[in-house]
Design a protein with these regions (language model features):
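Eukaryotic acidic, Ser/Thr-rich intrinsically disordered low-complexity regions
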Residues: 2-3, 114-145
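Buried hydrophobic core positions in alpha-solenoid tandem helical repeats
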Residues: 5-7, 41-43, 73, 77-81, ...
Length: 145
């Protein structure tokens, strides 16, 4: 399947279908490097106005960590960073969770990830969400050490 068709299916108007397809790619990515060369294509969608789409592509990039080489993730990390400060706390939490893959398979990125997540401004989130994000940050920091 060509890259354009993959992207088209991942941004399908039917969010449920697009989400299921993204899950399938995530599962496949644990077994094969079939999608690793799509990291730049995935990164091009990180600024989409739809938070579901932005998050979906952030997670898919992280899913490629085990196969990435030649700084493939490092080269797009600046495009990924804004999602870690997204106004929607669920976006931030999902992205923090996805970064566990990167820390596991790309230990050379631990310092840049730690620096990035340590600067997340928790004060912009409701009192009910800020502690959960803080917990996610702490878990990721511990894994990165």
């Amino acid at each position: 399947m060509n890259n354009n068709l993959v992207i088209k299916k991942l941004i399908d108007k039917d969010d449920k279908q697009a989400y299921e397809y993204a899950k399938r790619i995530g599962i496949e990515s644990a077994k094969t490097n079939k999608y690793v060369d799509m990291i730049p294509d995935f990164a091009s969608m990180l600024q989409d106005k739809n938070s579901f789409i932005r998050t979906r592509f952030f997670i898919l990039i992280c899913d490629q960590a085990r196969w990435a080489s030649n700084n493939q993730i490092e080269n797009v990390f600046d495009q990924m960073k804004p999602l870690l400060n997204d106004p929607k706390p669920t976006v931030v939490r999902q992205c923090l969770n996805a970064l566990h893959e990167v820390i596991l398979f790309r230990p050379e990125m631990c310092d840049v990830i730690k620096n990035t997540i340590s600067s997340i401004d928790l004060s912009i989130y409701k009192d009910s969400m800020a502690p959960l994000i803080k917990k996610d940050i702490d878990e990721l920091m511990n894994r990165a050490d």
